[in-house]
């Protein structure tokens, strides 16, 4: 069987030092403080590409020679989920310039893997000894702690015969012919489940750093294969796990692969790994042997028991990756590697020091890499910066070079726009190549550099400052072709077009009767995939997503190279499908493409009909005011005459675009004075209350004074009146 289970007995006895280890384990190890001394450095474009350190360990000075080894792509992302369960990309910036690997001078069988982003952090291995090194965070200087990692000798790894292909006892070591050196690249997506996240740091920065250490060590071990493991993306399940993580390893692997098929479609990767924490476990991992490039089986789970060191976990990850490439475990009596313990030795996770691949593993890899099963390792992702130092005049355009035609080539045909002596732009040149460069000058802003290819694409424009014409397209999930299909990565994922691409213009997308009839057979004519046991049965809900079934309306016999064409007459229609040999590089053409509509709000994904919510389409008509569509950055790409960002304002001469387009209009200045004047005219003045109080006090005082004056005058009048009456009375009495 292809399923590999790693059974580890006595694993709880395995010790080592890492931040996540138990205190009991720490007490066994000697920790010392050292100050690394940088003695040499080579830079390119302002960044170190080679560096040498002197490092004192237990009173002896060792010299570390290091070379830059990047493994992060430019679009590397770390994902998590918010409280609503919606996946988000964490806003963290990661440097791809500070990951190094190398060796210790004077020790041929040595290996150094460190990050220099914030001090030195990583592993040193020579002989059968391993050391860990980390910056001393409380130190104001460049002090580091260094410690010897000494895993105790626990029980050996055991393998059940029913689960693993052991190396044939009659295996013969054959000489390997020298081959042309070819670089290979494996892109992996790693998922860290909740308990694992909490165990190794419970902080996104700390956990990310530890995963980087795993990948760095894996790359150093895979160096003899000329294989670079690229961490394409990382995912944390911090609040809750997305699948059940209990149970044995093979069931967990099945659940993870099922989840992967539905939720990792738009995150580029060749393999996906789930890292799970367990207090104790019999198994340390599971994967499918030789299935690295089969998208249905390209995955693995690694179980991290409590006492396992980070270094041992890296060895487990390397063994799982090796098994998925078809490598077998070593027969220790027949396989040698020049160091005490080989990588594919069952005891490798228990050991310290350098572990290398044996001659048996080298031959296994040679067989794998020359087979059709290794096709996913042939593509070369862009890694920046390059660890190779640029040399002007060697005929190769390297990092930070505009041109390099070599001494002879430059003499015969001098390069335009470029100075061959410096490999930089020549005087007066603004650019040298690219769609937005013309005769060494940048094209003007707003000039079309790429027309829309179909309704799922958008037209791009030069921005006047770069020679690059960025590629944008309509957001995945947007309806197309009269709302029958949806857009996927800039193309209308039309079933009609799929059939015409295969069988010509006389073909069309098959009827539902054709799909239901043929994809229910689970044979060469129709199925939902191929597994180790043969053709996979299509459940009723998934039959529109299995083999691509087309209707054919021509009398000409179809002939496709390397493929078998199957005909069927169903309900009066000629239905056709095809079959490629297993492992053929065009075998994916015989399946319905991912993203093809298979029902209301459903699309095909890995031969299953699933809800389309994973596409994340969230662009309604109101967002762009019915005058635009959302692009792949979720910004409105407006129709002609409508201006971004929301397609509300109009300008007759504007051809359409988004805030990402090179023809973005400059924002018009806001009419400040009219706005302020209008604001004051439309509102009555609001005097502060404390300014009104004195006014009222004065009024009240004046009123009081008036009342008092009035009262006094009235009193005077009354007194005068009384005096007159008294005078008159006295006069009358005299008379």
UniProtKB/Swiss-Prot annotation:
It is found in: Membrane. The chain crosses the membrane at residues 687-707. Residues 184-381 form the Peptidase M12B domain. Residues 19-180 form a propeptide. GO terms for molecular function: metalloendopeptidase activity. InterPro entries: ADAM_Cys-rich, Disintegrin_CS, Disintegrin_dom, Disintegrin_dom_sf, EGF-like_dom, MetalloPept_cat_dom_sf, Peptidase_M12B, Peptidase_M12B_N. Glycans are attached at residues 128, 226, 279, 359, 463, 489, 569, 585. Residues 1-18 form the signal peptide. Disulfide bonds join 293-376, 335-360, 337-342, 449-469, 619-630, 624-636, 638-647. SUPFAM superfamilies: Blood coagulation inhibitor (disintegrin), Metalloproteases ('zincins'), catalytic domain. The signal and the metalloprotease domain are cleaved during the epididymal maturation of the spermatozoa. Residues 19-686 are extracellular. Keywords: Cell adhesion, Disulfide bond, EGF-like domain, Glycoprotein, Membrane, Phosphoprotein, Signal, Transmembrane, Transmembrane helix. Residues 389-476 form the Disintegrin domain. Expressed in the testis and testicular sperm (at protein level). It is a single-pass type I membrane protein. One of its GO terms (biological process) is adult behavior. CDD domains: ZnMc_adamalysin_II_like (cd04269). The modification Phosphoserine is found at residue 729. Residues 615-648 form the EGF-like domain. Sperm surface membrane protein that may be involved in sperm-egg plasma membrane adhesion and fusion during fertilization. Could have a direct role in sperm-zona binding or migration of sperm from the uterus into the oviduct. Interactions with egg membrane could be mediated via binding between its disintegrin-like domain to one or more integrins receptors on the egg. This is a non catalytic metalloprotease-like protein. PANTHER family: ADAM A DISINTEGRIN AND METALLOPROTEASE DOMAIN, DISINTEGRIN AND METALLOPROTEINASE DOMAIN-CONTAINING PROTEIN 2. A tripeptide motif (QDE) within disintegrin-like domain could be involved in the binding to egg integrin receptor and thus could mediate sperm/egg binding. Heterodimer with ADAM1/fertilin subunit alpha. This is Disintegrin and metalloproteinase domain-containing protein 2. It comes from Mus musculus (Mouse).
């Amino acid at each position: 069987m292809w399923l590999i289970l790693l059974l580890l007995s006595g694993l709880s006895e395995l010790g080592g030092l890492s931040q996540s280890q138990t205190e009991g384990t720490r007490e066994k190890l000697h920790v010392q403080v050292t100050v690394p001394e940088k003695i040499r450095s080579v830079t390119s474009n302002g960044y170190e590409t080679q560096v040498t350190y002197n490092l004192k360990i237990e009173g002896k000075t060792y010299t570390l020679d290091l070379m830059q080894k990047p493994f992060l792509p430019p679009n590397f992302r770390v994902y998590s989920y918010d409280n609503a369960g919606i996946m988000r990309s964490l806003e963290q910036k990661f440097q791809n310039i500070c990951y190094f690997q190398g060796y210790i001078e004077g020790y041929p069988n040595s290996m150094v893997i460190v990050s220099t982003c914030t001090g030195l952090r990583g592993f040193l291995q020579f002989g059968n000894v391993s050391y860990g090194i980390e910056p001393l965070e409380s130190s104001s200087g460049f002090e580091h702690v260094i410690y010897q990692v000494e895993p105790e000798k626990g029980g050996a790894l055991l393998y059940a015969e029913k689960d693993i292909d052991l190396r044939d006892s009659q295996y013969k070591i054959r000489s390997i012919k020298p081959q042309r050196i070819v670089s290979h690249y494996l892109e992996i997506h790693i998922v860290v489940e909740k308990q694992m996240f909490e165990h190794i740091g419970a902080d996104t920065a700390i956990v990310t750093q530890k995963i980087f250490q795993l990948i760095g060590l894996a790359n150093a071990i895979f160096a003899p294969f000329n294989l670079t493991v690229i961490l394409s993306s990382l995912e944390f399940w911090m609040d809750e796990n997305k699948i059940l993580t209990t149970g044995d390893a093979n069931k967990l692997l099945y659940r993870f692969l099922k989840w992967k098929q539905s939720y990792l479609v738009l995150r580029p990767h060749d393999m996906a790994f789930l890292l799970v924490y367990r207090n104790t476990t019999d198994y340390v991992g599971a994967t499918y042997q030789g299935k690295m490039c089969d998208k249905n089986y390209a995955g693995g789970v690694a179980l991290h028991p409590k006492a396992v060191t980070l270094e041992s976990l890296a060895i487990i990850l390397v063994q799982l990756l090796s098994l998925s490439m078809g490598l077998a475990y070593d027969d220790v009596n027949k396989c040698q590697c020049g160091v005490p313990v080989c990588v594919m030795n069952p005891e490798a996770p228990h050991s310290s020091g350098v572990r290398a691949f044996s001659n048996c593993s080298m031959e296994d890899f040679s067989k794998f890499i020359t087979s059709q099963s290794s096709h996913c390792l042939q593509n070369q992702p862009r890694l920046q910066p390059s660890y190779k130092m640029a040399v002007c005049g060697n005929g190769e355009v390297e990092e930070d070079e505009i041109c390099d035609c070599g001494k002879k080539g430059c003499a015969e045909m001098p390069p335009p726009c470029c100075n061959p002596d410096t490999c930089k732009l020549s005087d007066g040149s603004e650019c040298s190549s690219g769609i937005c460069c013309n005769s060494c000058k940048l094209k003007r802003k707003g000039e079309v550099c790429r027309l829309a290819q179909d309704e799922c694409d958008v037209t791009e424009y030069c921005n006047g400052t770069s020679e690059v014409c960025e590629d944008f397209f309509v957001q995945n999930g947007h309806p197309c072709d009269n709302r029958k299909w949806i857009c996927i990565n800039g193309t209308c994922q039309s079933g009609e077009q799929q059939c015409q691409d295969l069988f010509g213009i006389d073909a069309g997308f098959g009827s539902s009767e054709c799909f239901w009839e043929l994809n229910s057979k689970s044979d060469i004519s129709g199925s939902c995939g191929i597994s180790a046991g043969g053709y996979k049965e299509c459940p009723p809900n998934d039959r529109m997503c299995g083999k691509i079934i087309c209707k054919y309306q021509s009398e000409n016999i179809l002939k496709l190279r390397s493929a078998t064409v199957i005909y069927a007459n169903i309900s009066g229609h000629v239905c056709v499908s095809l079959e490629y040999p297993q492992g053929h590089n065009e075998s994916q053409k015989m399946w319905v493409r991912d993203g093809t509509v298979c029902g209301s709000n459903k699309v095909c994904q890995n031969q299953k009909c699933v809800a389309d919510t994973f596409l994340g389409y969230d662009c309604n008509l109101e967002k762009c005011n019915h005058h635009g569509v959302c692009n792949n950055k979720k910004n409105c790409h407006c129709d002609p005459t409508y201006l971004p960002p929301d397609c509300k304002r109009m300008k007759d001469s504007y051809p359409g675009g988004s805030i990402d387009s090179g023809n973005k209009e400059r924002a018009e200045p806001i009419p400040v004075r009219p706005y302020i004047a209008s604001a004051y005219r439309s509102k009555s003045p609001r005097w502060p209350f404390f300014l009104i109080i004195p006014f009222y006090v004065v009024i009240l005082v004046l009123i009081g004074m008036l009342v008092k004056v009035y009262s006094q005058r009235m009193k005077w009048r009354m007194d005068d009146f009384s005096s007159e009456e008294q005078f008159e009375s006295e006069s009358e009495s005299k008379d």
